[in-house]
Amino acid sequence: MNPWTVVIHAQAEAELLSLPPDMRARFLRIAEMLEEFGPGRIGLPLVRPLTNKLWEMRMQGRDGIARAVYVAVQDRRLLVLHVFIKKTQRTPSNAISTALKRWSGVQ
């Protein structure tokens, strides 16, 4: 069976690079786990479903909480659409709409 691959949208890559180093390291670790084991074998507290086909990677660091919204696409690829620092309890609706816009632009 082919392994999974995590692909980062160009705008999400810029957002990822703006995160503090400890959160970037957590993102890389979760991405490695998703590639190695597949999305079906990784769950809370590292990833959780959002809406439709969107999922979020959950990263916590010294400076707060960050999330990376991703979707599974063809050929066993996970496409990271949006990365942001979370400031409230709920995932902001504008973060979800940003991810959906980027996803529709890729399709």
Which ranges hold each PLM region?
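Basic, Lys/Arg-enriched alpha-helical interface segments
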Residues: 1-65, 74-77, 85-107
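Hydrophobic/aromatic beta-strand elements that line small-molecule binding cavities or substrate pockets
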Residues: 68-70
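ATP-dependent carboxylate-activation loops
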Residues: 81
